[in-house]
């Protein structure tokens, strides 16, 4: 899943950059580097012998290992491209881009080729002209396997993608319990049974205080269950929301959240500060349910959670989002970046990510060959993992970036201690 270090919480205001970039004309069309974007063979040939730098949050050792041991050798063998993986906080990446543009290092004079990015970071970088494109529509694997019109691909937390980034992976909220304590028929499936579960286990359920991105996602799942997917997803494209508009949509959901309070930890008068605290409370047995972006299979494998851990999503759905890859406007190796991104989107590498990391693929499963689809279906899952199609069928688009702080304010005004 996409780390919180690369989430909407990492948004950076790059003061003065918009004027600078607009003046320099940094938003370059995808065929402006002298290659016909329709001639993929020419792009591949131009990329040969390049060293391409992929920047992004580097805190996931399993992801880093997969890239260096699987993707990098593949790029070298197939295309003679050397992949350099650079771990860096997204704030520092955008600051580095800003500094390069202010120093006049535009077009192909930068140090960053492509970036792992999403949310407000993408919105900021795109608005300031730090991203090159549109390019995604020219990638063969996008053309063949990605539904670019799907809302969770075409919009990145409400910002139109418009070909300035290509999808990398998806993250979706999942709940889990210890199956040795909670029978299958007692697992919540919707807001009504979630309330009953809290009543049956008073004081042993809670969620992080919204403001923590997991806490906001949990209340979003429950609000969406109350409101219905269609009504909740209005928040996914509301790019200039007023508080009154958001309140009108989420009012029944907030009423429901208040109804949970008497049965929550501390009677809902206070909430844990963050998801790390909640995870520890669950591991210590203080709570009977936990949740997060993606299943806790790694914790089960490492002995931190029991092998009886069982994950689930609500029948009414759980929220999720997509993370992406974008090319810097001043990338020195744009062709190599395109080839590398295209390889990441190959069915084979997406399958490898699913097998190794449990990452939800961004490929449209219905567009895969029978052989590739069967390979995804045949992946052996751990005890705490859910089948890919179960998650995809229950996915709900998250509220867009500008809505999030409004939603959190409404929760703070209307729910704790009420």
For each predicted feature, which ranges?
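A ligand-binding cleft/hinge motif common to bilobed small-molecule-binding domains
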Residues: 122-124, 289-307
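Conserved C-terminal helix/tail region of periplasmic/extracytoplasmic solute-binding proteins
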Residues: 36, 280, 384-418
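N-terminal secretory signal peptides
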Residues: 1-10, 14-25, 31-32
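Short, polar/charged alpha-helical segment
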Residues: 39-48, 55, 60-82, 175
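Extracytoplasmic ligand-binding site segments that recognize negatively charged/polar headgroups
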Residues: 57-70, 86-94, 108, 112-276
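Periplasmic-binding protein-like
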Residues: 257-260, 305-326
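C-terminal segment of N-terminal export signals and the immediately downstream linker at the start
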Residues: 26-50
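Mature extracytoplasmic/periplasmic domains
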Residues: 318-319, 323-391
């Amino acid at each position: 899943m996409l780390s919180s270090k690369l989430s909407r919480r990492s948004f950076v205001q790059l003061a003065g950059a918009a004027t600078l970039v607009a003046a320099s004309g940094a938003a370059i069309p995808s065929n402006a580097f002298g290659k016909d974007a329709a001639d993929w063979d020419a792009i591949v040939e131009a990329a040969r012998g390049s060293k391409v730098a992929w920047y992004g949050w580097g805190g996931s050792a399993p992801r880093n290992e997969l890239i260096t041991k699987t993707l990098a050798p593949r790029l070298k063998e197939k295309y003679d491209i050397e992949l350099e993986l650079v771990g860096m906080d997204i704030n520092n990446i955008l600051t580095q881009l800003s500094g390069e543009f202010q120093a006049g290092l535009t077009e192909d004079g930068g140090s960053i080729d492509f970036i792992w990015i999403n949310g407000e970071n993408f919105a900021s970088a795109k608005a300031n002209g730090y991203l090159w494109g549109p390019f995604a529509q020219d990638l063969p694997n996008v053309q063949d396997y990605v539904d670019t019109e799907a809302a969770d691909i075409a919009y990145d937390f409400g910002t139109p993608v418009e070909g300035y980034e290509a999808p990398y992976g998806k993250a979706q909220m999942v709940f889990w319990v210890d199956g040795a304590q909670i029978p299958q028929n007692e697992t919540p499936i919707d807001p009504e049974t979630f309330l009953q579960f809290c009543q049956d286990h008073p004081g042993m359920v809670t969620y992080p205080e919204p403001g923590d991105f997991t806490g906001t996602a949990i209340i979003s799942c429950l609000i969406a269950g109350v409101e219905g997917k269609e009504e909740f997803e209005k928040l996914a494209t509301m790019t200039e929301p007023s508080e009154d508009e958001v309140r009108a949509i989420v009012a029944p959901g907030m009423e429901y959240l208040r109804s949970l309070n008497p049965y929550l930890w501390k009677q809902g008068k206070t909430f844990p500060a963050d998801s790390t605290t909640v995870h520890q409370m669950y591991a210590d047995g203080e709570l009977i349910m936990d949740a997060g972006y993606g299943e806790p299979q790694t914790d089960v494998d490492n002995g931190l959670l029991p092998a009886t851990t069982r994950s689930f999503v609500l029948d009414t759905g759980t929220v999720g989002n997509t993370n992406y890859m974008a090319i810097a406007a001043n990338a020195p190796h744009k062709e190599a970046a395109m080839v590398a991104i295209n390889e990441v989107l190959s069915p084979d590498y997406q399958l490898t990510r699913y097998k190794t990391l449990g990452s939800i693929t961004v490929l449209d499963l219905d567009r895969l060959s029978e052989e590739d689809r069967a390979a995804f279906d045949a992946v052996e899952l751990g005890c705490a993992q859910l089948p890919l199609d179960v998650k995809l069928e229950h996915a709900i688009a998250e509220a867009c970036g500008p809505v999030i702080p409004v939603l959190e304010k409404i929760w703070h005004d209307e729910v704790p201690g009420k």
